[in-house]
Amino acid sequence: MTIEIHDLSKQFGSFTALNDINLKVNPGELLALLGPSGSGKTTLLRVIAGLETADSGQVLFNEEDSTDKHIRDRHVGFVFQHYALFRNMTIFENVAFGLRVRPRKQRPNAPEINHRVTELLQLVQLDWLADRYPHQLSGGQRQRIALARALAVEPSVLLLDEPFGALDAKVRKELRAWLRKLHDDMHITSVFVTHDQEEALEVADRIVVMNRGRIEQIGTPDEVYEKPANPFVYEFLGHVNLFHGRVHQGHAWIGDLEVDAPEYSEAEDLSAIAYVRPHDIEVDRTLNGEPALAAHIVHILAIGPVVRLELAGKDNQSTNSIYAEISKERFRELQLARGDQVFIKPRKLDLFPNHAQNGSIH
């Protein structure tokens, strides 16, 4: 199933929830709608489902205009954050519910329903819980049952609204891997909403980054992480260091550090913002004859095989603390301690003169 969104807009009073959205979801794709609260991601999902009506624009399923179709005619499965399981029904009956309430002509017979439900419970690896009730299950188990119930009616499209948002971190991580594998096995066109950057990067085939009712960027996890389209995407996708500087005729200056910026060869003394991820910062005790920024260590935090350094710059090139991530081996080699002076330089940075177009400097 292909989903196409054309020129979609939606207002709630004076608030613009969606502003001229254009998007195509490919058959069998697992697409993430990622953004902060109020970005429009859930509204877009609900419009696709038929739970909300757009003020303008079109929703097409397999090139057929479905904008005005009722939700029951769109053949979508919907999974909510809070499960929405029927408390008075067993797990088996919860999964069977959508099949039992179908119109008589479309309703499978009892043996077919039993076979389908058993098959789905085996798929989500919870067939041994068929006779239990929702309150007897963990949060992760309940969410898997909610997904099985959505799949029972054999939807053409699966829509998930922050499906793991109510679960703890360990369970979320386990279910992310499980959902990715399940999708690879089933190849059903799926769209899920999340505000969790790691979740989107780990699970999705492509990510749609949204902000204030607009799409900021569409791309694979690698594309949006390695080549952010603008400062918003850069700051939203994981930890990042922000430096203030200037760019002039193909060169950029951040404090005393000069780097080549050939894509801005025609720039004339523009203010600029440079972004560097913590793992792209080299740390050394000496200058080694190369330009670098001086800083001192404020805090040291070891996280597994990685050591995270909080640094304070000697100049005003960064308005906040600077963070660098190095391996434990490198940390031991440098014999670093709190208060030590170090010299830092970026392996890679992305420069945005006047918050304009993206350029990568290596």
From Swiss-Prot:
Recorded coiled-coil stretches: none
Catalytic reactions of this protein: sulfate(out) + ATP + H2O = sulfate(in) + ADP + phosphate + H(+); thiosulfate(out) + ATP + H2O = thiosulfate(in) + ADP + phosphate + H(+)
Segments forming domain ABC transporter: 3-237
Residues annotated for ATP binding in this entry: 35-42
Keyword presence, Chaperone: no
GO MF annotations in UniProt: ABC-type sulfate transporter activity; ABC-type thiosulfate transporter activity; ATP binding; ATP hydrolysis activity
Role played: Part of the ABC transporter complex CysAWTP involved in sulfate/thiosulfate import. Responsible for energy coupling to the transport system.
PANTHER family cross-referenced by the UniProt entry: SPERMIDINE/PUTRESCINE IMPORT ATP-BINDING PROTEIN POTA, SPERMIDINE_PUTRESCINE IMPORT ATP-BINDING PROTEIN POTA
Name of the featured protein: Sulfate/thiosulfate import ATP-binding protein CysA
Organism lineage: Bacteria, Pseudomonadati, Pseudomonadota, Betaproteobacteria, Nitrosomonadales
